Amino acid sequence: MKNGIVIVVLLLIGFSTRAQVKAEQMAPEISLPGVQDTIIHLSSLKGKVVLLDFWASWCAPCRASIPGVIKLYNKYKGQGFEVFGVSIDSKKSDWIKAIAQDKIKYTQVFDKAGWYSKTAVKYGVDAIPNTFLLDKTGKIVAIDLDEEQLENKIKTLLN
């Protein structure tokens, strides 16, 4: 009986987690509406080093990380670095308000399906903030680095 319970629990755990993309994989395409409702494609940034940042307006750790992301964006944007923010807010108005409050100038897209969006599932996002660093070819080279590690990796990829 105990073995049966253990097997059921392991199966449930296996089915409840998402398979996250891994470093060295090509980043799956993302095509979502931006602030002006035009569709923006992640692939449009090929040729640049890209920080893909999954976040939401209601996520305190996400909002706390934004000043550091803005600092990196402002420092390296002229050298071929871009940020592609993906909001999983359920209300567009909350997302727009957060962009204004935090003075975000980098590319932002909105996926109103939230946690259950195809994009979040494709990337295995089950907690936010969740970041993926892409090289100039669109390959994922790092996931969820701290700010210092991220800056060092960006510098390496830009040189």
Task: For each feature predicted by the language model, list its residue ranges.
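Structural microenvironment flanking redox-active thiols in thiol-disulfide oxidoreductases
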Residues: 64-102, 115-120
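Thiol-/selenol-based redox modules, centered on thioredoxin-like
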Residues: 130-159
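Short beta-strand segments
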Residues: 53, 83-87, 109
